[in-house]
From Swiss-Prot:
PANTHER family in the cross-refs: RIBOSOMAL PROTEIN S7
MF (Gene Ontology): rRNA binding; structural constituent of ribosome; tRNA binding
The species this protein was found in: Deinococcus deserti (strain DSM 17065 / CIP 109153 / LMG 22923 / VCD115)
Assembly, per entry: Part of the 30S ribosomal subunit. Contacts proteins S9 and S11.
PROSITE patterns named among the record's database cross-references: RIBOSOMAL_S7
Protein name: Small ribosomal subunit protein uS7
UniProt GO BP: translation
Gene3D superfamilies tied to this protein: Ribosomal protein S7 domain
GO cellular component, one term: small ribosomal subunit
Length: 156
């Protein structure tokens, strides 16, 4: 464990198109090797595709997908007297955001479509409708927490 003080969280600047901090966080999550311009093109291209296919406001569909993926509880390992228990704990807002975007991107990577724009758009639309890889991951995590509810009294 580091003994220095915890690094402060720098506030994220909203993106230029939607003026939304969550969109900025998603673009940063898409970005590889510092190529933010490419990441932005992928995200906004996916938004255009969502608009064409659903006829709805892409930011609204993205927020709906985000809310559907967001985990409420997760399990954390807690060692008590020689045995390790999977203890269900509530997820903080910051961790909810990072888990949601991480799960969304790993689900996007596993999709069969050819281009990154199509994969991202497909995952956003699927998640908004309650299906897709990221939703499955969230359900698995919450099911695990539900199965271990008996150990909730070990929460710290």
């Amino acid at each position: 464990m580091a003994r220095r003080r915890q690094a402060e969280v720098r506030p994220l600047q909203p993106d230029l198109v939607y003026q939304d901090v969550l969109v900025s966080a998603m673009i940063n999550r898409i970005m590889e090797d510092g190529k933010k311009n490419l990441a932005s093109r992928i995200f906004y291209g996916a938004c255009r595709l969502v608009q064409e296919r659903t006829g709805q406001e892409p930011l609204k569909v993205f927020k709906q997908a985000y809310d559907n993926i967001k985990p409420r509880v997760e399990v954390r390992s807690r060692r008590v007297g020689g045995s390790t228990y999977q203890v269900p704990v509530e997820v903080s807002a910051r961790r909810q955001q990072s888990l949601t975007l991480r799960w969304m991107m790993s689900a996007v990577d596993g999709r069969p479509e050819r281009t990154a724009i199509e994969r991202l758009a497909g995952e956003i639309m699927d998640a908004a409708q309650g299906r897709g890889g990221a939703i499955k991951k969230k359900d698995d995590v919450e099911r695990m927490a539900e199965a271990n509810r008996a150990y909730a009294h070990y929460r710290w």
